[in-house]
């Protein structure tokens, strides 16, 4: 008998950590309170099976403790707090089951190149005259050189909108992704920047002549 009481008291202590004590039911019959709680919960049950099992097992064991210990043990449970516990549990289960929306492979690759990769880069910025490379690199690039296809150009345009002067590591990633040489990528960005500057220069010279 004593071991059953000790075991039930241990359960009671663990339940009390989850449910705030109150004096609402202090002078009422404990067993009737638990039965009423169980009936109401069964009538309004929309929770997950695991949550329901925890709820009913806890009440059943507390009822057993009530019959053993009688008036020596006071049960003070708040129905609202017990329901709030179940609601919090359900919300947590729903949040854990949430699936994040997926993004397209192209968008993900673009974000990776223009933002995340920059954390691993050197602080040095390549200047525009960086286009001159060593003789060996020129020879290698000529052997492997191929024309940029439309899909590669479209991707470079997207990158250029976000970053007009990518560093060396970013250009290497782009070249590797599309199977072209590093020098082709560097030339493309240099030419693109120059073309962007030309209209401004022409507009400035025409305004000066007038």
Curated annotation (Swiss-Prot):
Provide a GO biological process annotation. negative regulation of conjugation with cellular fusion
Subcellular location, principal: nucleus
Q: What induces it?
A: Moderately repressed by HBR1 in response to hemoglobin and growth signals.
PROSITE patterns xref list: HOMEOBOX_2
Among Gene3D superfamilies, the record links this protein to: Homeodomain-like (1.10.10.60)
Any Pfam family matching the protein: Homeodomain
Entry keywords, A to Z: DNA-binding, Homeobox, Nucleus, Repressor, Transcription, Transcription regulation
Q: Where in the cell is it found?
A: Nucleus
InterPro entries this protein is in?
HD, Homeodomain-like_sf
GO cellular component term, pick one: nucleus
State the source organism's domain of life: Eukaryota
What are this entry's molecular-function GO terms?
DNA binding; DNA-binding transcription factor activity
> Does Repressor count among this protein's keywords?
yes
Q: Which residues bind DNA?
A: 141-200
- Transcription regulation: is it a keyword of this entry? yes
Q: Tell me the function of this protein.
A: Mating type proteins are sequence specific DNA-binding proteins that act as master switches in yeast differentiation by controlling gene expression in a cell type-specific fashion. Transcriptional corepressor that acts in conjunction with ALPHA2 to repress transcription both of homozygote-specific genes and of genes necessary for the white-opaque switch, a prerequisite for mating.
* Similarity section: Belongs to the MATA1 family.
Subunit relationships: Forms a heterodimer with ALPHA2.
Q: Any extra detail in the entry?
A: The C.albicans mating-type-like (MTL) locus contains, in addition to the genes for the regulatory proteins (MTLA1, MTLA2, MTLALPHA1 and MTLALPHA2), a and alpha idiomorphs of a phosphatidylinositol kinase (PIKA and PIKALPHA), a poly(A) polymerase (PAPA and PAPALPHA) and an oxysterol binding protein-like protein (OBPA and OBPALPHA). Most C.albicans strains are heterozygous at the MTL locus and do not readily undergo white-opaque switching and mating, but mating occurs in hemi- or homozygous strains. Mating takes place in opaque cells, produces tetraploid progeny and seems to occur rarely, if at all, in nature. Conservation of mating capacity is rather thought to be due to the simultaneously regulated white-opaque switch, which seems to play an important role in host commensalism.
Name of the protein: Mating-type-like protein A1
